[in-house]
Amino acid sequence: MSLPFPFEPRCLPTTLGSLPHTDAAQATALLLAYTPEIPAWVQLPKRTWHENMLVQYLEGLPGIVEENERAYFDTSRPGYDDALTDFFARYLAVESGDDAALETFAITPERSRGWPALLTALPKRFHPPVVAKGQVTGPFTWGTNLTDQNRRCAYYDEQLHDVIVKGVALKALWQIKHLKAFGAPVMIWMDEPALLGFGSSTFIGISREDVLRDLNEVAGAIHNAGALAGVHCEANTDWSLLMEADLDILDFDAYDHLEAITLYPDELRAFFDRGGSLGWGIVPTLNPQAAATETLESLLARFDAGVASLAARGFERKLLLRRALITPSCGAGTLTPPLAERVLGLLRELAATLRKREGFAGG
């Protein structure tokens, strides 16, 4: 792994994107206020079903049917073969540098009010962001949750599998193109909650090599466009697999699952040696009571304990802090708006406290 640009986050905060609000301008203003250095475009799943992570990126894919808040591929419909051929033709055109073809994979305002809200807000800022962040649903999560007309996982269909992996890459490339226009470096994170079940009987027949190949194909496209590639998984998974993948950022649930990272010291060391950074999901969002009761002091103590645990395994403390992003443990879209705003406040406070304490605040 060779980073597309030098990146040491030094405890800067960022978010995973989702908020429970329904007004995109208000939600975007919140993210820009609390995470101005690495803002993400906001996802608003409570505004409409179309902002659900499984359907938000479906535009431009062949054979998609949406009915009764269910989305699936129908490969039996008349015209599907032509649509499939057209999809791959547009993909090849994008690979050849055709901007018009790339625009056929746009995320429209109906699926993401937060996207145009961020693009409108960014030019009004006095300082450009350190990095602009986009996000996509990862190929494993998308492929194992979307089905065909017979409710068979798309991941197990060779053609649909290929469509999904290339679809993720195309949605990432479209975001990179538009975010780069603001003059800031770009990172794209893949959201992979379904990796929690990788290796279980639920996903029998899916190999480690399959998952690595898909992640690396998307990451390769992101890197070729000059952006950083990251993955978020909010629960326990085989982190050694993700550490082996060609990824620059791994975002984990440091609040409830810190031990998941500490199980793989050799793989983590190799990840750091390649320039990788960790997103510490230390501000809780999955447990509303924890989100309501944790304090700056309690989260600081929990974060320091996590750093100490890795330092005890031979990692240099300063390296851990230089390569740390401070994030929520998961998206905040399931919380109430006041609680989500409390999470953002804690996130900002914790990052600012760490950066001041460690001497990062000036750089």
Where are these regions (language model features)?
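Alpha/beta catalytic barrel-like cores
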Residues: 1-156, 276, 312, 322, ...
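Acidic (Asp/Glu)-rich catalytic clusters
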Residues: 32, 118-129, 177-183, 243-244, ...
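A cross-family glycoside hydrolase active-site/sugar-binding cleft signature
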Residues: 41-44, 133-137, 189-191, 230-234, ...
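Glycine-rich anion/phosphate-binding loops
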Residues: 103-120, 158-174, 298-306
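Surface-exposed amphipathic alpha-helices with a cationic face
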Residues: 119, 123, 172, 176, ...
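Active-site loop segments of alpha/beta catalytic cores
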Residues: 134, 153, 159-266
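Active-site-proximal beta-alpha loop/turn segments in soluble metabolic enzymes
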Residues: 145-161, 189-206, 282-292, 327-336
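Catalytic-face loop-and-helix region of soluble metabolic enzyme cores
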Residues: 248-361
